[in-house]
Amino acid sequence: MPTSANKSLSIDPHSALPGRTEPLKVSPNHAVTDHTIEPVPENMEVAYFGMGCFWGVERLFWQQPDIYTTSAGYSGGTTANPTYEEICSGLTGHAEVVRIVYDPAKNSYENLLKLFWENHDPAQGMRQGGDIGSQYRSAIYTVSPQQHELALASREHFQKAMQQQSDNRPITTEITEAGPFYFAEDYHQQYLFKNPEGYCGLGGIGVCLPKMNEN
Protein backbone atom coordinates (compact mmCIF):
# COMPACT_ATOMS: atom_id res chain seq x y z
CA MET A 1 0.00 0.00 0.00
CA PRO A 2 1.32 3.48 -0.81
CA THR A 3 1.95 5.90 2.02
CA SER A 4 2.14 9.65 2.31
CA ALA A 5 5.67 11.02 2.10
CA ASN A 6 4.88 13.07 5.21
CA LYS A 7 2.09 11.70 7.39
CA SER A 8 2.15 14.90 9.43
CA LEU A 9 0.67 16.88 6.54
CA SER A 10 -2.95 17.01 5.40
CA ILE A 11 -3.69 15.01 2.26
CA ASP A 12 -5.09 16.54 -0.91
CA PRO A 13 -8.58 14.99 -1.31
CA HIS A 14 -7.77 14.22 -4.95
CA SER A 15 -4.83 12.10 -3.79
CA ALA A 16 -6.78 10.17 -1.15
CA LEU A 17 -7.33 6.42 -1.32
CA PRO A 18 -10.69 5.45 -2.85
CA GLY A 19 -11.93 3.22 -0.04
CA ARG A 20 -14.94 0.96 -0.50
CA THR A 21 -18.73 0.98 -0.51
CA GLU A 22 -19.21 -1.61 2.24
CA PRO A 23 -18.74 -0.43 5.85
CA LEU A 24 -16.59 -2.40 8.26
CA LYS A 25 -18.59 -4.77 10.44
CA VAL A 26 -18.77 -4.15 14.19
CA SER A 27 -20.54 -5.88 17.06
CA PRO A 28 -24.16 -4.73 17.41
CA ASN A 29 -23.83 -4.07 21.15
CA HIS A 30 -21.42 -1.99 23.21
CA ALA A 31 -19.06 -4.25 25.17
CA VAL A 32 -19.35 -2.12 28.33
CA THR A 33 -22.90 -0.74 28.40
CA ASP A 34 -24.50 -3.53 26.30
CA HIS A 35 -26.58 -0.86 24.56
CA THR A 36 -27.11 -1.23 20.83
CA ILE A 37 -24.68 0.75 18.68
CA GLU A 38 -27.21 1.50 15.94
CA PRO A 39 -29.57 3.19 15.57
CA VAL A 40 -29.03 6.18 17.85
CA PRO A 41 -32.17 6.59 20.02
CA GLU A 42 -34.25 9.65 19.18
CA ASN A 43 -33.79 11.21 22.62
CA MET A 44 -30.00 10.97 22.43
CA GLU A 45 -27.41 13.33 20.95
CA VAL A 46 -24.05 12.60 19.34
CA ALA A 47 -20.62 14.19 19.77
CA TYR A 48 -17.42 13.53 17.82
CA PHE A 49 -13.95 14.11 19.27
CA GLY A 50 -10.43 13.40 18.04
CA MET A 51 -7.79 13.39 20.79
CA GLY A 52 -5.10 11.10 19.46
CA CYS A 53 -5.23 7.30 19.69
CA PHE A 54 -8.90 6.45 20.04
CA TRP A 55 -8.41 3.55 22.47
CA GLY A 56 -7.86 5.77 25.50
CA VAL A 57 -10.29 8.42 24.30
CA GLU A 58 -13.13 5.93 24.06
CA ARG A 59 -12.45 4.64 27.58
CA LEU A 60 -12.41 8.17 28.98
CA PHE A 61 -15.93 8.77 27.74
CA TRP A 62 -17.52 5.39 28.46
CA GLN A 63 -16.38 5.78 32.07
CA GLN A 64 -18.50 8.91 32.44
CA PRO A 65 -22.04 8.70 33.87
CA ASP A 66 -25.02 8.84 31.52
CA ILE A 67 -23.07 7.92 28.40
CA TYR A 68 -25.17 5.59 26.24
CA THR A 69 -22.50 4.29 23.86
CA THR A 70 -19.06 5.13 22.53
CA SER A 71 -17.53 3.99 19.24
CA ALA A 72 -14.07 4.21 17.72
CA GLY A 73 -13.93 5.35 14.13
CA TYR A 74 -12.58 7.60 11.44
CA SER A 75 -13.79 11.02 10.31
CA GLY A 76 -12.66 14.33 8.88
CA GLY A 77 -11.18 12.95 5.68
CA THR A 78 -12.07 11.70 2.23
CA THR A 79 -11.70 7.91 1.93
CA ALA A 80 -14.99 6.02 2.30
CA ASN A 81 -15.08 3.16 4.84
CA PRO A 82 -11.31 3.14 5.38
CA THR A 83 -9.37 0.41 7.12
CA TYR A 84 -6.92 1.04 9.93
CA GLU A 85 -4.06 0.16 7.58
CA GLU A 86 -5.28 2.83 5.17
CA ILE A 87 -5.59 5.37 8.00
CA CYS A 88 -1.99 4.70 9.00
CA SER A 89 -0.83 5.34 5.43
CA GLY A 90 -1.68 9.02 5.78
CA LEU A 91 -3.64 8.87 2.52
CA THR A 92 -7.24 9.04 3.78
CA GLY A 93 -7.33 12.46 5.44
CA HIS A 94 -9.18 11.03 8.42
CA ALA A 95 -8.53 11.46 12.13
CA GLU A 96 -9.06 8.77 14.74
CA VAL A 97 -12.35 9.87 16.28
CA VAL A 98 -14.67 8.68 19.02
CA ARG A 99 -18.43 8.98 18.64
CA ILE A 100 -20.21 9.60 21.94
CA VAL A 101 -23.94 8.99 22.23
CA TYR A 102 -25.38 10.66 25.32
CA ASP A 103 -28.64 11.78 26.89
CA PRO A 104 -28.68 15.61 26.87
CA ALA A 105 -31.23 15.56 29.69
CA LYS A 106 -28.60 13.95 31.95
CA ASN A 107 -25.31 15.12 30.48
CA SER A 108 -24.31 18.26 28.62
CA TYR A 109 -22.17 18.99 25.59
CA GLU A 110 -20.32 21.54 27.73
CA ASN A 111 -19.30 18.74 30.10
CA LEU A 112 -18.05 16.66 27.19
CA LEU A 113 -16.04 19.65 25.95
CA LYS A 114 -14.44 19.99 29.37
CA LEU A 115 -13.32 16.35 29.20
CA PHE A 116 -12.04 16.93 25.69
CA TRP A 117 -9.85 19.93 26.46
CA GLU A 118 -8.51 18.72 29.81
CA ASN A 119 -7.45 15.24 28.72
CA HIS A 120 -5.13 15.76 25.75
CA ASP A 121 -2.71 18.32 24.33
CA PRO A 122 -4.60 20.45 21.78
CA ALA A 123 -1.50 22.34 20.63
CA GLN A 124 0.58 19.61 19.01
CA GLY A 125 -0.66 19.79 15.44
CA MET A 126 -0.55 16.48 13.59
CA ARG A 127 0.48 14.37 16.57
CA GLN A 128 -0.34 13.49 20.13
CA GLY A 129 2.72 12.75 22.19
CA GLY A 130 4.66 9.92 20.60
CA ASP A 131 1.84 9.17 18.16
CA ILE A 132 2.75 11.10 15.02
CA GLY A 133 0.59 11.63 11.94
CA SER A 134 -2.51 13.44 10.74
CA GLN A 135 -4.72 10.67 12.15
CA TYR A 136 -3.76 11.78 15.67
CA ARG A 137 -4.75 15.43 15.28
CA SER A 138 -6.99 17.20 17.77
CA ALA A 139 -10.47 17.66 16.32
CA ILE A 140 -14.07 18.48 17.18
CA TYR A 141 -16.67 17.64 14.56
CA THR A 142 -19.99 19.31 15.33
CA VAL A 143 -23.50 18.20 14.41
CA SER A 144 -25.47 21.38 15.09
CA PRO A 145 -25.00 25.16 15.13
CA GLN A 146 -25.26 25.08 18.93
CA GLN A 147 -22.47 22.52 19.22
CA HIS A 148 -20.32 24.52 16.81
CA GLU A 149 -20.78 27.75 18.76
CA LEU A 150 -19.97 26.04 22.05
CA ALA A 151 -16.91 24.33 20.58
CA LEU A 152 -15.50 27.61 19.25
CA ALA A 153 -16.19 29.40 22.53
CA SER A 154 -14.56 26.61 24.52
CA ARG A 155 -11.44 26.80 22.35
CA GLU A 156 -11.15 30.52 23.06
CA HIS A 157 -11.61 29.92 26.79
CA PHE A 158 -9.03 27.14 26.87
CA GLN A 159 -6.52 29.22 24.91
CA LYS A 160 -6.81 31.98 27.52
CA ALA A 161 -6.43 29.44 30.32
CA MET A 162 -3.25 28.13 28.70
CA GLN A 163 -1.85 31.64 28.41
CA GLN A 164 -2.59 32.27 32.08
CA GLN A 165 -0.29 29.33 32.84
CA SER A 166 2.44 30.70 30.54
CA ASP A 167 1.67 28.23 27.76
CA ASN A 168 1.55 30.49 24.71
CA ARG A 169 1.36 27.78 22.07
CA PRO A 170 -1.55 28.28 19.67
CA ILE A 171 -4.28 25.66 19.84
CA THR A 172 -4.33 23.57 16.66
CA THR A 173 -7.66 21.82 17.24
CA GLU A 174 -9.72 21.47 14.07
CA ILE A 175 -13.37 22.50 14.60
CA THR A 176 -15.61 21.81 11.63
CA GLU A 177 -19.06 20.52 10.79
CA ALA A 178 -19.16 16.73 11.03
CA GLY A 179 -18.93 14.73 7.84
CA PRO A 180 -19.36 10.96 7.55
CA PHE A 181 -18.23 8.85 10.51
CA TYR A 182 -16.88 5.42 9.64
CA PHE A 183 -16.69 2.74 12.33
CA ALA A 184 -13.24 1.31 12.95
CA GLU A 185 -12.64 -2.43 12.90
CA ASP A 186 -14.39 -4.41 15.62
CA TYR A 187 -11.16 -5.16 17.49
CA HIS A 188 -10.72 -1.41 18.05
CA GLN A 189 -14.15 -1.07 19.66
CA GLN A 190 -13.93 -0.75 23.46
CA TYR A 191 -10.34 -1.93 23.07
CA LEU A 192 -9.18 -1.12 26.60
CA PHE A 193 -12.16 -2.94 28.10
CA LYS A 194 -11.15 -6.06 26.21
CA ASN A 195 -7.43 -5.42 26.77
CA PRO A 196 -7.08 -3.59 30.12
CA GLU A 197 -3.28 -3.52 29.92
CA GLY A 198 -3.30 -2.12 26.38
CA TYR A 199 -1.64 1.07 25.23
CA CYS A 200 -3.10 4.40 26.29
CA GLY A 201 -1.26 7.61 25.47
CA LEU A 202 -4.01 9.91 26.72
CA GLY A 203 -2.94 12.78 28.95
CA GLY A 204 -3.72 16.43 29.52
CA ILE A 205 -1.47 19.46 29.99
CA GLY A 206 -2.63 20.41 33.48
CA VAL A 207 -4.92 23.23 32.35
CA CYS A 208 -8.60 23.36 33.30
CA LEU A 209 -11.35 24.71 31.06
CA PRO A 210 -13.02 27.67 32.81
CA LYS A 211 -16.78 27.76 33.00
CA MET A 212 -18.17 28.90 29.69
CA ASN A 213 -19.86 31.97 31.19
CA GLU A 214 -16.59 33.17 32.71
CA ASN A 215 -14.15 35.50 30.95
From Swiss-Prot:
Disordered: annotated segments: 1-27
Name the keywords, alphabetized: Oxidoreductase
- UniProt GO molecular function: L-methionine-(S)-S-oxide reductase activity; peptide-methionine (S)-S-oxide reductase activity
- Give the highest taxon in the source lineage: Bacteria
What reaction(s) does this enzyme catalyze? L-methionyl-[protein] + [thioredoxin]-disulfide + H2O = L-methionyl-(S)-S-oxide-[protein] + [thioredoxin]-dithiol; [thioredoxin]-disulfide + L-methionine + H2O = L-methionine (S)-S-oxide + [thioredoxin]-dithiol
Name the protein family: Belongs to the MsrA Met sulfoxide reductase family.
Q: What does this protein do?
A: Has an important function as a repair enzyme for proteins that have been inactivated by oxidation. Catalyzes the reversible oxidation-reduction of methionine sulfoxide in proteins to methionine.
Q: This chain belongs to which protein, by name?
A: Peptide methionine sulfoxide reductase MsrA
Lineage of source species: Bacteria, Pseudomonadati, Pseudomonadota, Gammaproteobacteria, Enterobacterales
